[in-house]
């Protein structure tokens, strides 16, 4: 009986480990097309977390000043596994974590549109596609590497949930216009 229990637990662990796959890279769009706005209460953003890992901000820190454990932990988490300065510089950038939910079964596209300091009003965009999405989801986007080093910080952003070619949920930064 104990052997059967151990085998069942091992099988369950293998199945659950297969479900916990990391998100692949987001699809970058050449041009963000304009879509009609038809907000629907069945789709909503719950929370959006933004963080910046910028070498210039690190250098501006006063030596010996306390930044708090959370900021230092976030910086250490972003650079975990980087073995040289090139790998660390590829991880500098803006990070977005979006928590959203839907109460309907539908194919949902999550889009992050953003402007960067060096590009003025030009809008960049990244997308993730979720077939038959229902329930709560956590998705991440990042603007890092050469894109960040050449074009600068993300100065404004907006997140969209798109279903059947229409915007059903929207959240934006205060700088978006």
Regions found by a protein language model. Name each.
Residues 153-167:
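Internal, hydrophobic beta-strand segments that form the core of beta-sheet-rich folds
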């Amino acid at each position: 009986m104990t052997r059967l229990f151990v085998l069942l637990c091992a099988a369950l662990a293998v199945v659950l480990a297969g479900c916990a796959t990391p998100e692949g890279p987001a699809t970058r769009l050449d041009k963000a097309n304009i879509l009609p706005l038809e907000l629907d209460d069945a789709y909503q953003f719950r929370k959006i977390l933004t963080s910046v890992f910028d070498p210039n901000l690190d250098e501006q820190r006063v030596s010996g000043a306390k930044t708090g454990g959370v900021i230092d932990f976030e910086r250490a988490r972003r650079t975990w596994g980087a073995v040289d300065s090139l790998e660390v510089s590829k991880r500098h950038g803006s990070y977005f974590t979006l928590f959203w939910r839907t109460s309907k079964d539908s194919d949902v596209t999550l889009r992050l549109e953003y402007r960067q300091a060096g590009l003025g009003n030009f809008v960049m965009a990244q997308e993730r596609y979720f077939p038959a999405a229902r329930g709560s989801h956590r998705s991440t986007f990042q603007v890092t590497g050469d894109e960040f080093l050449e074009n600068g910080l993300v100065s404004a952003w907006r997140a969209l949930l798109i279903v059947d070619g229409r915007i059903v949920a929207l959240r934006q930064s205060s700088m978006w216009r």
